[in-house]
Amino acid sequence: MKRLLLLNACLTLVCAGVFAQPKLNENNIPEVVKAMTAEEKALFVVGIQQNAEPYRGKYLPGTGGVTYPIPRLGIPSIVMMDGPVGIRLNDNETTCFPTGLLTAASWDRSVARRIGEGIGEESLDMGNDVILAPGMNILRNPLNGRNFEYFSEDPVLSGFIASAFIDGVQSKGVGTSAKHFAANNQETNRLDADSRLDTRTLREIYTKAFELCVQHSQPWTVMASYNYLNGTYTQESRELLTGILRNDFGFRGLVVTDWTGRRNTPKQINAGSDLLMGGSPSQTAHILQSLENGTLKMEDLDRACTKLLELIVKTPSFKGNRPSLKPDLAASAKVARETATEGMVLLKNNGALPAKPARAALFGVHSYCMIQGGNGAAWVHSPYIVSPAEGLKNAGFKLDQSLEKLYTGYAAFISEDLKYNHKVNVHVGDAQKPELEITPELIKNTALNNDIAFVTLGRISGEARDRILKRDFLFQENEIKLLETVCEEYHAAGKKVVVLLNICGPVETASWSDLPDAILCTWLPGEEGGNAIADVLTGKVNPSGRLPMTFPLDYFDAKGADNFPYQFVSNKANESAVHPERRGLPLKDIAYTDYSEGIYVGYRYFCTNSKPVSYPFGFGLSYTTFGYSKASVKVKGQNVIASVTVTNTGAAAGKEAVGFYVHAPLGSFSDKPSVELKEFGKTRLLQPGESQTLTFSVPVRQLASFNSEKSRWETAKGSYTAFFGADATNPEAEATFKVASARNYSATRACEPQIGAN
């Protein structure tokens, strides 16, 4: 009997050893990976789209994707949702915050952080674990369809605004996904276009923002983009994802692919892609085949599984979050309104603003039907949209009822017409609304009965297609005619005209900017845009936004402007130019794009070449004035410490954005930009006569330029000039400092061009 009991005990111990299964926690990830079968690993690293069987109906419609659960090991699914200005769901209402462009125009990290916190809070309410944002590609060209979603033409402004957004979201225990890495700067043929650029340009312009946000904020994930980079898909580039991102930048999180299955699966994993989204059964099968034939090593698959598990244990889903599906929309709306005011840019003001509540005539369909945000992954199903008309009424203006009735009826009709018009093809969201023709007689009559006129001009864009020069950058003849007639009649009556630019990116202004008395760039300001616009127009909030990109006089003034599909409209007739398997001879700017301007993107080109622009990078007016004094810059160890005192010299309370620009000696380089932004900040609200000293600390390493031949960063020895002031062309104060000896910093040799850019 004793022998039988002993045998049973031994069998129990053996079985326990064989069949014991670890349950995932923060401390046993290697053990869990070891316990996973090859099939489970192959399923695990391939994402699931929310409408795929057997998951259809389990997740909220519009969910971006989920991960594969393994219940026996305690591994849950986690949820990923768009987007950068609020959670994108098909049916559930969430807050539409201001777009990335407006956020960057605030030149204020706290604004980006508040928006991030708001999106993080709503993520918890809606059961989201990772928000697929921020989008932070450089505004290489004014016509990129997703410029509204991104931040700036400058990598420092982009990187630090992104970092603050990431800090805000992740402070709520929700992950982020910095995207799209890297050199993903056009929507035309976005799945297969080859971005061709030298490594100096890649490092100084197109990956610098990612470097800064990784080193300062460590996003939980980075999203690898669709495009080729110098002949290799970014998702298959080990040099990019492992060499640059992990080894050089120190990224510790997970690399997720942008949503496509048309890549070489083992190459993606070998390169450093950890989670393949949106996922398909064929990818899982390909992984298992690759393990068998040796094209994929188990150690690389284990690395991907490890990174995904490291992400999962941080998520709300793993920690037992119970989503309410009832976000605090009122609290978020307050944040949306307040942050929107911070990034609106006053471009012109000849005594028209601030305006007191009065009788007002509002022209332009977007005065009554405001564009809150763009299309695609950044579209948000918000509970409402406050138009400029509603915002001005809320502020006490009495609107011209004949115009209001005419425009609201037209807006309702055209919205319904566009909704069912098969010719309108947008990824998700709204469509551009054509302007209504208003007779000169009606305009003249309104000038007699109103005290001020507002004309709203709107432009929308979105994912999957770029803007067109003649249709989007230039205003149409009927729009200009409307503005001309309104200005003529109202000026004849001794009354002011204010233009509101409800726009997704730069537009041509030089041909008409002399007509109105004031121009306020409101961008795409989110659901509370109308109230925020009224706050700025009335002086309740003093405008403090500054342009995060240059507004050129002419589209072709920018170097490299012709190396972009500025007049390409996708249709069946030109599909052979887009898809690689159907290409005859690859078409320039569609199959590939030469970044021929090199590092001279935006203000770096215009300032270095003293080329005139409509409005320079960093430009923006205020209802008050500021003075600068006590500029000082010193090198202390590994950092440059700069400070300047800003004083409100005007009669109204206001905030001042301040850029810290540097002109560097050439060192071993034949050319460098005349100025480059290295840091920025914003004062608190200063009362008249009040001062504040802003201090910046910049690593000496951030003064460096990238030497492609030697694959290293070089900070030159010698005398540097520092400039203070947001406007890149108009410094308010300056100081000099010296770097006593040259300093070099090695970097991975990676992503070198295979074909020279033209």
Question: Where are the regions that the model predicts?
Answer:
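Bacterial Sec-dependent N-terminal signal peptides
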Residues: M1-K23
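Glycoside hydrolase catalytic-domain context in secreted enzymes
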Residues: F19-S705, R712-T729, A750-N758
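Short beta-strand elements
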Residues: P731-A747
